[in-house]
């Protein structure tokens, strides 16, 4: 093999190594941001945003109040142990004479009462029993990372 071919092969190998390391690092950062229990520092200020409302304090306060009202309603706190031993929590609201059951999974880095406080009344008024699940790695459920319901 000529010197020129060796240099080209070395350059290509070095480039591939740098690209691989960069891809690994970026992927790790993105996965950690998406799945880790703790919210990244740069996202702390987004915690109180409600879709379409910006940071309107009245809307945020109203949604939080509805969440507190939902939590205060009669319900049963439930817990299961996943196949990997992690304890997962939920909140069962039974509607006598229900016609359907809703399993409600809160959004990314949120909570059941924050996401469903404003719409829970609709479910119950329409003859639904509802299980508000707490995602793995969030709130009272165990685990170090979110599973988005895929591993439960």
Per-segment meaning from a language model:
Residues 122-142:
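Conserved alpha/beta-hydrolase
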Residues 1-15:
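Membrane-penetrating hydrophobic segments
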Residues 83-94:
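A short loop-to-beta-strand scaffold at the N-terminal edge of the catalytic core in hydrolase folds
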Residues 99-107:
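Short beta-strand element of the alpha/beta-hydrolase
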Residues 89, 106-107, 138:
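Histidine-centered divalent metal-coordination motifs
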